[in-house]
Amino acid sequence: MEFSAKNALIPGSFDPITLGHLDVIIRASGIFDRVTVAVLANAEKHTMFTVDERLAMVSLAIEDEGLKNVGAVSWDGLTSDA
């Protein structure tokens, strides 16, 4: 992934996504041209939901808010490698 000053990366486990997470995403969408929400997969962390379920929840929240400049991806590497 390539990022510039006009792009933002919001990493997290989102297990599950909360209104607080969504507030940060909405605010970022108003500041940046493109926002990518990275749903982190960490095999060592015990989560309530699978990464696919968390990605689906995040994607649904983004769609429900009508955020056209926001996308969600799953990520299993270091955030610094994104």
Listing of model-derived features with the role each one plays in the protein:
Residues 1-82:
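Nucleotidyltransferase catalytic core that binds NTPs
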